Regions:
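C-terminal transmembrane helix and the adjacent membrane-cytosol boundary/short C-terminal tail
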Residues: 136, 177-204
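Membrane-cytosol interface at the C-terminal ends of specific transmembrane alpha-helices
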Residues: 75-126, 132-141, 192
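Single conserved hydrophobic/aromatic residue that forms the stacking wall/gate
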Residues: 1-10, 15-16
Length: 204
């Protein structure tokens, strides 16, 4: 039926939005984590300001960000993407910087003692240690964002949550049930795939 096709398309849009938001946040957080880490960046004031900025972003709930972006850019998936991106930057930035801080300093110091450049130290001494952690955490947040997608849709940030809300208001209970089942299936598939990928990365 048309409603099934529409829900499927909206579900696909939700997956694309969530994955894009998480992917962009990951790209932004990698350089942020280096600047916020005492292993790489020695200017304490800059590190302090960046960490407080990340604390502020992380301290505002994703629902509040969604309302702000819906007001600024109107209804639709773009507001949802920005909400996911903003919250993920705050949280992943903190997690990435902590992972960088906890990297084995002996390997980094060993390369520095040989006169290696800062870029070489990061490329060969640091990234091999932290890259699996970054990927694992990013996948987990993509999985978590899929669950948040329904809430984002309720406030008008697009996605399958908006379709669910509209059908509940219209009392189309058969279509409501179909969308709920679709959400459960999508979450189960993404959870399973993410868990398998993260397990393989950690095992390696």
């Amino acid at each position: 039926p048309p409603s099934a096709i529409l829900s499927g398309l909206v579900g696909s849009e939700m997956c694309i939005r969530d994955s894009l938001g998480t992917f962009l946040a990951t790209l932004v957080c990698i350089p942020i984590s280096f600047v916020a880490s005492r292993q790489i960046f020695k200017f304490g004031l800059i590190r302090f300001l960046i960490k407080r900025f990340l604390d502020f972003i992380r301290g505002v709930d994703i629902l509040i960000w969604a309302i702000i972006y819906v007001r600024a850019f109107g209804l639709g998936p773009f507001a949802g993407l920005l909400s996911i991106f903003t919250v993920d930057v705050g949280t992943l930035g903190k997690l990435f910087s902590e992972a960088t801080d906890n990297a084995d300093a002996r390997q980094i110091e060993g390369m520095q003692s040989t006169g290696a450049s800062k870029v070489s130290v990061i490329r060969y001494g640091l990234i091999p240690q932290i890259f699996p952690i970054f990927i694992s955490q990013s996948l987990y947040f993509f999985e978590s964002n899929t669950r948040s997608a329904v809430i984002l849709g309720v406030v008008g940030a697009g996605g399958i949550g908006l379709q669910l809300t509209e059908r509940m208001k219209a009392q189309y209970w058969d279509q409501t049930l179909f969308i709920i089942i679709l959400i459960l299936i999508m979450v189960a598939i993404i959870d399973t795939a993410s868990r398998i990928i993260r397990k393989n990365i950690i095992d390696e």
